[in-house]
């Protein structure tokens, strides 16, 4: 499971001219699901994101998490995070999970964030969406559950 996490002052997602999800300060999370992802990937990523300290404290240091700030999350499913551009000029998305697998895992991810007490808004799975955001910082982090399981390199 792969997430592009953007710290925002506000973000919204629109489908067919209607705003379907919007937040104030918090995180916009673009979420992609891989063919091999499981509930373990959901739990790992949700826990890491909820506790990730990427908000500044009074001294300007990254010491606060989404939980600490009381911010919200806007979760938008995005299969294109698994684009393979190694061959040709048109990306392949064969690594992305099929919708019948991905949709329940995205729903479970949003539920997992809510269990931490985080207010969560969402896009519409599989819809053509327009995402608007004001990136704060900017702070943008890419996180992948497969990489989180790898051992850290020794210095």
From Swiss-Prot:
An aminoacyl-tRNA editing enzyme that deacylates mischarged D-aminoacyl-tRNAs. Also deacylates mischarged glycyl-tRNA(Ala), protecting cells against glycine mischarging by AlaRS. Acts via tRNA-based rather than protein-based catalysis; rejects L-amino acids rather than detecting D-amino acids in the active site. By recycling D-aminoacyl-tRNA to D-amino acids and free tRNA molecules, this enzyme counteracts the toxicity associated with the formation of D-aminoacyl-tRNA entities in vivo and helps enforce protein L-homochirality. The keyword Zinc does not apply. The gene is dtd. This is D-aminoacyl-tRNA deacylase. One of its GO terms (cellular component) is cytoplasm. It is found in: Cytoplasm. It comes from Chloroflexus aggregans (strain MD-66 / DSM 9485). Its main location: cytoplasm. It is an enzyme of class 3 (hydrolase). Belongs to the DTD family.
